[in-house]
A protein has these predicted regions:
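Long, charged/polar, surface-exposed segments that mediate recognition or autoinhibition
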Residues: 79-131
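Non-cytosolic coordination micro-motifs
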Residues: 25, 34-44, 50, 130-144, ...
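N-terminal signal peptide c-region/cleavage motif recognized by signal peptidases
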Residues: 17-19
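N-terminal secretory signal peptides
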Residues: 23-89, 164
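A cross-kingdom feature marking solvent-exposed beta-strand/loop segments within repeated
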Residues: 56, 70-72, 121-139
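Amphipathic N-proximal alpha-helical interface segments
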Residues: 63-100, 141-168
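Sec-dependent signal peptide recognition
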Residues: 3-11
Length: 168
């Protein structure tokens, strides 16, 4: 009986510490008590990436304003899916942010995607590895990096990673 009660308590505590529903990431962050500066930055990022999917927020159950939080949003498209992740780390009036956006497309090759990105921004630095199975695209200012990973004949996984230090 004690084991059964422990399992129920564990399930309830996990449910209370993890939110998974379709409200916005920034709304989840505010509701969970995440630092207001971090929540504001998350709102801006959410709008710039046009995130509108299933969201999950991980925040400390008793000290969410002072400790890092993790925010995830997944979306499905007619030609693939994407998952966005942001880690917010509060530091008094500042907030440090790392983001990762992984998009899987099943009807466009990595070569096509790479070519399109270079056409839009010719100054991008492009490096290919493992017989072209991986491509890293980096702007001159190193504000982000994109990794293209070949997925079969006509698919590609696009991973974009950023680290932000707003106000510092």
């Amino acid at each position: 009986m004690e084991l059964y009660i422990n399992k129920i308590l564990l399930a309830v505590s996990l449910f209370l510490s993890i939110n998974a529903f379709a409200s916005s990431l920034s709304d989840d962050a505010i509701e969970r008590g995440v630092n207001s500066t971090c929540s504001s930055y998350l709102n801006q990022i959410e709008k710039s990436y046009k995130l509108n999917g299933l969201n999950i927020t991980f925040a400390h159950p008793t000290n969410s304003a002072s400790l890092p939080s993790l925010h995830i949003s997944s979306q499905k498209y007619n030609n693939g899916s994407s998952t966005f992740s942001a880690t917010l780390t509060p530091d008094k009036e500042y907030c440090y942010i790392s983001t990762v956006l992984v998009t899987s497309v099943n009807n466009q090759t990595c070569s096509e995607i790479s070519q399109l990105k270079i056409e839009v921004a010719p100054e991008l630095q492009v490096s290919r590895y493992a017989d072209g199975n991986f491509t890293i695209i980096t702007p001159k200012d190193n504000t982000y990096q994109i990794i293209l990973t070949v997925q079969g004949e006509t698919g590609c996984t696009i991973t974009e990673a950023r680290m932000l230090w707003p106000g510092r």
